[in-house]
Amino acid sequence: MVDYDGNYVDMYVVNTATGERKSALKKLRSNTNFTQNDWSPDGNWVIYFQNKHWHALNTADGISKNLTQALGVAVHNEQHDAPAPAGAYGTGGWTSDSTSLLIYDRFDVWQVYVDGRKAQNLTRGEGRKSTIRLRVQRI
């Protein structure tokens, strides 16, 4: 659907063995952050950005968890000044064991866990203190 409020997509989880298709998410904005969806290495989780927060969808049970609500910092672009929702600062990707992923706020890097463990600020707030954007660089 395309209207004055932007482009939306629905997400489905498909069992590749049986072809069974289940509706997982409805009305995700595709024009801001749909391309930022990212599957966990084990395929059990997919993250998506909606309503200024990162969420993880468990593909087995269809339950979503808000990963960033308790951080106390914005993970969306606070300086966004346009008539559309602000986008995310992005992610640094999943850990190889699929238990957590790296998420950016404006300056720092956070490790958030899909099992509900408390998030960790990996850069210890040094980016915010120095107003320097710290990001993961794969070499």
Named regions from a protein language model:
Residues 1, 43-46, 98-101:
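Hydrophobic beta-strand positions that form the internal "hydrophobic ladder"
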